[in-house]
Amino acid sequence: MDFLGYGMNPHDYHLKVIETGRTEVLLTFSDYNLLRQSAAKDIFPAAAEKDMGVINGWSIMRGWLTGATVESFIPREKWNEDHIRADRMRIWCMERDMNMLDLTLQFCLQEHRIHGHPIGNLNIEQLKKNIAATQTTLSDDVFEAFSDAGM
């Protein structure tokens, strides 16, 4: 079979599939965004070594990393550490008059071992905002300041 794709969450499963060489592209989700970059440690290097494509699902974490309040998605009493951190990131961006969606997507686009970011748009307005965010230029200083903030 040619052109087989693979999508699964546990990294061990991805790594086993990569070793077989029987797939062309991998779909990771929730593994590379502002909240976590776990795929960069093992999946991206292994896939690059085998010349496999990587699709990065959940770049915006179902909207939590767009600048909308996390509470608009999930009641505060149900928040976990990811929700708390996403809200801190939103506030950090607001304090700097920065568009969080720009930061989120530009961060993901800097990783050249990722070949696609399926965002998902609910309407034309979201599509336009997502396109604009991918075309924004942010300085290295912005990413350095974000990293230094330790969120």
How would you label these PLM feature ranges?
Residues 1-151:
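Beta/alpha (TIM)-barrel catalytic core signal, keyed to glycine-rich beta->alpha loops juxtaposed to Asp/Glu
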